[in-house]
């Protein structure tokens, strides 16, 4: 992971933390284990915050299951902002 991806990850984690209330370091550890399942309301708020933060559209699956894949989000954002 290069510096741009790492910085993007930390911004994504910050946005997720603002919704879930979980500590950023704990979220990073959670995402090392795989995607994080959240309820529908949190999912939509996380997607909205991340899209607003990076001024982009993530085209996330809005039908569920409501899993947050931090690495996939970072990949989408870095490809959009090349």
UniProtKB/Swiss-Prot annotation:
Pfam families hit by this protein: DUF6137 (PF19634)
Q: Which residues form a coiled coil?
A: none
* Pathway recorded for this protein: Antibiotic biosynthesis; butirosin biosynthesis
Q: Where are the transmembrane segments?
A: none
What's the Enzyme Commission number for this chain? Answer: 1.14.14.13
Quick one: a GO biological-process term for this protein? antibiotic biosynthetic process
- Function in brief: NAD(P)H:FMN oxidoreductase component of a two-component system involved in the biosynthesis of the side chain of the aminoglycoside antibiotics in the biosynthetic pathway of butirosin. Together with BtrO, mediates hydroxylation of gamma-L-Glu-GABA-S-BtrI.
The annotated subunit structure for this chain is: Homotetramer.
The name this protein carries in UniProt is: 4-(gamma-L-glutamylamino)butanoyl-[BtrI acyl-carrier protein] monooxygenase BtrO
Taxonomic lineage from the root: Bacteria, Bacillati, Bacillota, Bacilli, Bacillales
